[in-house]
Amino acid sequence: MSDDFLTSEQTENYGRYVAEPNEVQLARYFHLDERDLAFINQRRGKHNRLGIALQLTTARFLGTFLPDLLQIPSFIRFYIAAQLNISRPEILSRYAERDNTRWEHQGLIKLYYDYHDFGDFPWSFRLKRLLYTRAWLSNERPGLLFDFATAWLLQNKILLPAASTLTRLIGEVRERASRRLWRRLALLPDSWQKTQLDGLLEIPEGQRMSVLEEMRKGPVTISGPSFTDALERYTRLRSMEFSRLNFSGLPAIQLRNLARYAGMASVKYISRMPDERRLAVLTAFVKAQEISALDEAVDVLDMLILDITRSAKNIGQKKRLRTLKDLDRAALLLARACTLLLDENTDEAALRQAIFRRIPKDKLAESVGKVNELARPQDTHFQDEMVEQYGRVKRFLSAMLRDLHFQAAPAGEHTLSAIHYLAELSGSKKRILDDAPEQIISGPWKRLVYEIGRASCRER
């Protein structure tokens, strides 16, 4: 794993002044309190007092000491000098004449303010443990881990090491966390499952792509065949029995990351991986893909049912429009008959003859039949047209009942019973269903479901 992950900006800004501090930073890092002044005023000479004060405030702000104090922005030098009643900050050049003085002052600052070197125990160990925990539980980029480590070192008064030291440490920690994950994942499948995993990388005879590449492809259309293909993909993954493996204790985000990697990497590259890593990548892929394949199949089913319902509604509305004139004609004829029926001047004894004189009996009977045929109750939602769509449902119904395992909340127990009953009925030639669960059959469906008072199976 490469340690060269820092951006050029991160490398240039590490342990250096990037810009002048703002007011909040000045107050927090560069203000000298009574304790600071007591420590600083123990030094002889204004140049020594200014030099050690700048080293102290730089260590607070940057987390490290600078080899050349003239790299400190002039604004900060003037700000510190003013607090020490030094009118000419230029005397700092005298402080730079003796390196030993600068090193001695660094030692005094570390001792007085409890700063530690990066290699001091237990600080480096604590940082490694924190980095390892984050690398194990999350999928943070190494650049973010670098920023976290820098902030932690600054907060705990640990002097920053060289940037290369910190990047190398982060690379080693991430590598160790990855190898632990690969090792634990590779131990989960048994020998039969490992053979199945290796089979994913093979290209079946007569095919142009490997099984793994086929498993990556999800549904792209909404149709019965598309749902059947999605269901077959799910059952193939489920048959590998990875759902019975114990993935507890493994970070979910890392499993998803490995599975995503398997979905993008070339089959040849995965084939050339070491055994442990290859098994880990494929195990994570099958685990995640089994769940997503089921979700995709159910999504296709949901949209397919919605499409079937919409088609039935459109067909019903078109039928309604086509027959509207016939319905109007029959309704007007019946309205004329009802007008005579409501006329107080019509003799009740001769009512039938009066109606039939104006409206022939056969025409009246035809109109009644037409109204009964075309008029729809208010609670009807195109059930007849839904039944006409059964041919589309029949293509995938048996596979759905066989391969999908449904569960239900208490409110859906009746629906679940009906699904289980249909699954048991699959392949049966029974026409009259004496033992069918009838709780979900609502009013509008009863005229289509019941035959001679009993539930019937009209479609096969």
Question: How should each PLM-predicted stretch be described?
Answer:
Residues S2-R460:
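Long amphipathic alpha-helical coiled-coil/heptad-repeat bundle
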